[in-house]
């Protein structure tokens, strides 16, 4: 019969503590890039949907990560990370 391997790794900080630290970092980054009213509305939506639960914390983390990723990917003006936007010709000549 197989046995589970013994836990030989170093102790990690509790998952809940790490999750709350991640949420705090994401919130701090989000307020630099998005209007507070949008973020407040997102928080209200999450609270109304999930209440005060860990599922709500996980949902808002996932949404903030996606928003920030897309924001940086399309070219944030606050950062050098992202795709440089090229000007498109008005006559549509660049289309194939």
Swiss-Prot record:
Keywords: Activator, AIDS, Apoptosis, Cell cycle, Host G2/M cell cycle arrest by virus, Host nucleus, Host-virus interaction, Ion channel, Ion transport, Modulation of host cell cycle by virus, Phosphoprotein, Transcription, Transcription regulation, Transport, Viral penetration into host nucleus, Virion, Virus entry into host cell. Residues 1-42 are annotated as: Homooligomerization. Changing residue 85 to R: In strain: Clone pNL4-3. InterPro entries: RetroV_VpR/X (IPR000012). Phosphorylated on several residues by host. These phosphorylations regulate VPR activity for the nuclear import of the HIV-1 pre-integration complex. Pfam families: VPR. The modification Phosphoserine is found at residues 79, 94, 96. Changing residue 71 to C: Complete loss of G2/M cell cycle arrest. Changing residue 28 to S: In strain: Clone pNL4-3. Changing residue 95 to Q: No effect on ion channel activity. GO terms for cellular component: host cell; host cell nucleus; host extracellular space; virion component. The keyword Transport applies. It is found in: Virion; Host nucleus; Host extracellular space. The keyword Nucleotide-binding does not apply. Changing residue 62 to A: No effect on incorporation in virion. Changing residue 67 to S: Partial loss of nuclear localization. Complete loss of G2/M cell cycle arrest. GO terms for biological process: DNA-templated transcription; monoatomic ion transmembrane transport; protein homooligomerization; regulation of DNA-templated transcription; symbiont entry into host cell; symbiont-mediated activation of host apoptosis; symbiont-mediated arrest of host cell cycle during G2/M transition; viral penetration into host nucleus. Belongs to the HIV-1 VPR protein family. Homooligomer, may form homodimer. Interacts with p6-gag region of the Pr55 Gag precursor protein through a (Leu-X-X)4 motif near the C-terminus of the P6gag protein. Interacts with host UNG. May interact with host RAD23A/HHR23A. Interacts with host VPRBP/DCAF1, leading to hijack the CUL4A-RBX1-DDB1-DCAF1/VPRBP complex, mediating ubiquitination of host proteins such as TERT and ZGPAT and arrest of the cell cycle in G2 phase. The infectious clone pNL4-3 is a chimeric provirus that consists of DNA from HIV isolates NY5 (5' half) and BRU (3' half). HIV-1 lineages are divided in three main groups, M (for Major), O (for Outlier), and N (for New, or Non-M, Non-O). The vast majority of strains found worldwide belong to the group M. Group O seems to be endemic to and largely confined to Cameroon and neighboring countries in West Central Africa, where these viruses represent a small minority of HIV-1 strains. The group N is represented by a limited number of isolates from Cameroonian persons. The group M is further subdivided in 9 clades or subtypes (A to D, F to H, J and K). During virus entry, plays a role in the transport of the viral pre-integration (PIC) complex to the host nucleus. This function is crucial for viral infection of non-dividing macrophages. May act directly at the nuclear pore complex, by binding nucleoporins phenylalanine-glycine (FG)-repeat regions. During virus replication, may deplete host UNG protein, and incude G2-M cell cycle arrest. Acts by targeting specific host proteins for degradation by the 26S proteasome, through association with the cellular CUL4A-DDB1 E3 ligase complex by direct interaction with host VPRPB/DCAF-1. Cell cycle arrest reportedly occurs within hours of infection and is not blocked by antiviral agents, suggesting that it is initiated by the VPR carried into the virion. Additionally, VPR induces apoptosis in a cell cycle dependent manner suggesting that these two effects are mechanistically linked. This is Protein Vpr. It comes from Human immunodeficiency virus type 1 group M subtype B (isolate BRU/LAI) (HIV-1). The gene is vpr.
